[in-house]
Amino acid sequence: MMMDKRGIKKIINEVTPDIIAMRRHIHENPELSGEEVNTAAFMAEKLRSFGVEVEEHVAGTTAVLGYLKGGKPGPVIALRADMDALPMTEETGLPFASKSPGKMHACGHDGHMSILLGAAEVLSRIKDDLSGTVVFICQPSEEKSPVGGAKGLIASGALDGIDAVYGLHVWPTLPSGTIGVLPGPMMAASDHIRIVMKGKTSHAAMPHKGVDTIVAAAQFLTAAQTIVSRRVNPLYPAVLTFGKITGGTRYNVVADTVEIEGTCRTYHEEAQDAVETYLQDTLKGMDAMYGTESTLYYERGYAAVRNTPVQADFIAGVVRQCLGDEGLADVQEPAMTAEDFSGYLQHFDGGFFWLGATPQGQTVYPLHNTHFAVDEKCLPIGVEIMVSLVLAKTA
């Protein structure tokens, strides 16, 4: 079958019931990061049924790679979907809601996987006319920040030889079926911060005989908020949030240990470097003032997801060809949430985009919300864009 636009849409219409059925099966059978055993087996089974060569347990994980070789020589283009769910109890009320209490596809990975499988089914039908090879990446542990699943997969060398890789994320704040893409950063770098402050216990009535880590921690948390407002270049956005603090053993004992955990989100390495440096400097000041001994554990997690201007224009052009100008959402700014797809873009050419997933007029539930669910009408559109990206790169 010739790979014209009309022919592709016809195939997508034919396989849309399969796409929806696969999405519903995945949605009601969620598995957490690193535990995607049944999910991976399902992905492998479906890929094989489309005539795709499959490799399982890649890099010693649940990762699955599928290879579809076209009838003509050409580049190697990869499409990626993440497989893991979140430790949340679903409240969508869907007839195909999660069957596993405390586990839910609340970040749309069920949509990502069904789109990947849909793209595989479509491309397999036209493989004789396809130039090059398509690699389907079924990645575990995207939610397992700050390590994630992409890093190990890339480091294993299993993806060596790829010429370009493309990924998407369903996006509830965009109208269903529209595409959002930006040059430069689209999603933020995500770093994990852990601080341990050590002091000395004493009776609460004799605080001068101890070293109070709770007081020191309180001062540190206040002082740290000036890092973003006064030490980081204001042209480089940064978010510094501490979401957890633990310390003390009893109400009338001066606490000798406090642990603080938080995250830093940035788009630029300059801001990332500045936050880490000034956190360390602030802790040194607290130690000098209060007599504490503090240790900063600053773990750099996912890098920022960045599209080159060339790739952003390429994706936008494909969207216009498929959906017209109205298919491109008016996206003005990136997000401070993170995605380990950035790891692929640090090693390979490629790009990333958002797929609108909420019907107009309906309540917008954010990602990681117990009520979030992907609008199934956006799924065939995601398939069309993924397939069209492959065809445009291999033409």
Residue ranges and their predicted role:
Residues 2-105, 110, 114-130:
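Acidic/His- and Gly-rich active-site-bordering loop/insert found
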Residues 26, 66, 79, 109, ...:
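Divalent metal-coordination and catalytic microenvironments
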Residues 68, 197-199, 264:
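Hydrophobic beta-strand positions in extracellular immunoglobulin-like domains
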